[in-house]
């Protein structure tokens, strides 16, 4: 588990997303929503990592280049030793599907440069020796979908997402 019962939890996202999140899901105890440009580490100064810190970046890295995610992760490892970063990721095929409309609007041709992983531990783990990387399937890694109340079609979609598109929740301990 990431939470030791004392650590602070930080939700990281772009300011407009955090504003909406604040309306729909206000931060709980020990939790803080941080509106920021993750490419600018000025937000590091807002973090109190004493007692531990867990960072969530949900749905964010699909819009970042792999190099930008690598630099952020290394910077966080420097600034928050003992901290944890949790985010969702997917393979190249899934990222193309997820970002298709956005990429077309932004006139981006090289989708291959955008952050995508198939095997998080193997691919991200090589970025820095301090990183302890684990991942679980986005759907099947956390839920037992064999319950009769779960439709066969939903189970099929979960298998396609987790196995075919390598959709996953990644946890990096610094």
Task: Give the positions of each predicted feature.
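Alpha-helical subdomain
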Residues: 1-174
């Amino acid at each position: 588990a990431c939470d030791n019962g004392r650590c602070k939890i930080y939700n990281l996202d772009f300011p407009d997303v955090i504003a909406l999140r604040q309306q729909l899901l206000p931060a709980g105890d020990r939790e803080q929503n941080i509106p920021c440009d993750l490419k600018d580490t000025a937000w590091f100064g807002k973090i109190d990592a004493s007692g531990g810190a867990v960072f969530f970046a949900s749905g964010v890295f699909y819009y970042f280049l792999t190099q930008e995610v690598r630099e952020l992760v290394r910077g966080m490892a420097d600034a928050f030793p003992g901290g944890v970063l949790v985010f969702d990721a997917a393979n190249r095929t899934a990222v193309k599907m997820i970002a298709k409309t956005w990429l077309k609007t932004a006139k981006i041709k090289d989708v291959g440069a955008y952050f995508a992983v198939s095997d998080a531990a193997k691919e991200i783990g090589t970025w820095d020796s301090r990183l302890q990387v684990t991942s679980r399937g986005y759907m099947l890694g956390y839920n037992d979908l064999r319950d009769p109340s779960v439709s066969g079609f939903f189970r099929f979609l979960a298998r396609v997402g987790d196995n075919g598109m390598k959709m996953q929740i990644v946890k990096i301990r610094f």
